């Protein structure tokens, strides 16, 4: 993705089957990638990847510095269990959604942001915030990510 070209040392979590969404399988791949990196990581995730990242985060919380969660999918739409997803994340996070996302209502994205203890930003009519909705390069998203990193660094200073 464009984000990968803008952020050095970025690694994409490859899924065995991008067309088959299985939360436990996808979360396992996120955990494997975090383990392979070795250092603490920042997460940028989109759609179902947000759910996988949040699920993985609870088992690797000490290894995650923060997360930008863009257009999170609604787990109910995929028949996924939500019990684990209903806890606050122990690191800074921002959920970005759209008022006309076909995969999740803005109210559901805001609900999940609240459950996760994430800041929430609705960027208006932006669809699923992907290439299909007219987003290729997304400088505003990169700026949001860099601000999240900066605010996190300020918050952890003594």
Predicted regions and their residues:
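Conserved alpha/beta-hydrolase fold motif
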Residues: 42-43, 67
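Short beta-strand/loop motif that positions the catalytic acidic residue
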Residues: 89-90, 94-97, 101
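A conserved short beta-strand
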Residues: 62-75, 92
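Gly/Ala-rich beta-loop-alpha elbow adjacent to hydrolase catalytic centers
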Residues: 44-53
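Catalytic histidine-centered segment of alpha/beta-hydrolase-like enzymes
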Residues: 21-24, 126-137
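Active-site catalytic motif of lipid deacylating hydrolases and related acyltransferases
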Residues: 1-39
């Amino acid at each position: 993705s464009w984000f990968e070209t803008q952020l050095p040392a970025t690694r994409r979590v490859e899924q065995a089957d991008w067309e088959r969404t299985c939360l436990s399988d996808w979360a396992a791949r996120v955990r494997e990638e975090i383990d392979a990196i070795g250092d603490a990581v920042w997460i940028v995730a989109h759609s179902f990847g947000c759910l996988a990242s949040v699920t993985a985060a609870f088992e690797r919380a000490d290894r995650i510095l923060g997360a930008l969660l863009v257009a999170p999918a609604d787990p109910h739409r995929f028949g996924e269990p939500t019990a684990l997803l209903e806890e606050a994340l122990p690191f800074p996070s921002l959920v970005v959604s759209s008022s006309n996302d076909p995969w999740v209502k803005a109210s559901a994205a805001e609900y999940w942001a609240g459950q996760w203890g994430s800041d929430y930003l609705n960027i208006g009519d932006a669809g699923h915030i992907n290439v299909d909705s007219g987003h290729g390069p997304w400088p505003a998203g990169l700026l949001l990510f860099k601000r999240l990193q900066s605010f996190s660094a300020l918050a952890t200073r003594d």
